Amino acid sequence: GKTQPSGFAYELFLDEKGEKISKSKGNGITIDQWLEYASPESLSLYMYQNPKRAKKLYKEIVPKTVDEYLDFMEKAKNQNELQLLMNPVWHVHNGLIPQEDTIMSFSMLLNLVEASNADSKELLWKFVKKYKKDISEKEHLIFDNLIGYAIKYFNDVIKLQKKYKKPDTSEKLALEALVKTLNDCNDEMLPEDIQTLIYSTGKEN
């Protein structure tokens, strides 16, 4: 005859097809796997949002969640006290939100990993600093960690899903012409001249 205790209703996690996650099928991502590809704070954000709604939990959701985390971090810089309370990152960090400028999104960083074929943080930092000369690893610890996560995620998830088309005869000739053009370039040439040669090779083939 007493008042029933207040319960907390929650939904199960689903895979990318909307089906229940099964250990035997391996159709999801574990906590340990998430933490290999992104920060604990990004996982906390994912868990914090919409606890009563069934959510899809799979590897491809990680970049989107990380970018949401970075976006909330940026918004927090210009929010008042009331707005901060509505910002999930404020709760993720217990009110102590790190102050660091966002260099680029995680999705863009993944594209840079693919384009540069970088396999180490040091190499990827060199590419980043070509466009952002006033940044350093020590002053951007969150971004430094993101670089490591991006390389790991690309190699484990994106790269394994890549399917490369076998070039036909005309495409093979065009690629061979491009290789010859690049081999003819030297360190004394301006980037603009190299770009012009590459463009001309493409038009000719």
Per-range role (PLM):
Residues 1-6, 14-25, 31, 180-187, ...:
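Active-site cores that bind ATP or allylic diphosphates and position pyrophosphate for catalysis
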Residues 130-205:
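Basic, alpha-helical terminal appendages of large translation-related enzymes
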Residues 11-148:
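Catalytic adenosine-cofactor/nucleotide-binding cores of aminoacyl-tRNA synthetases and other
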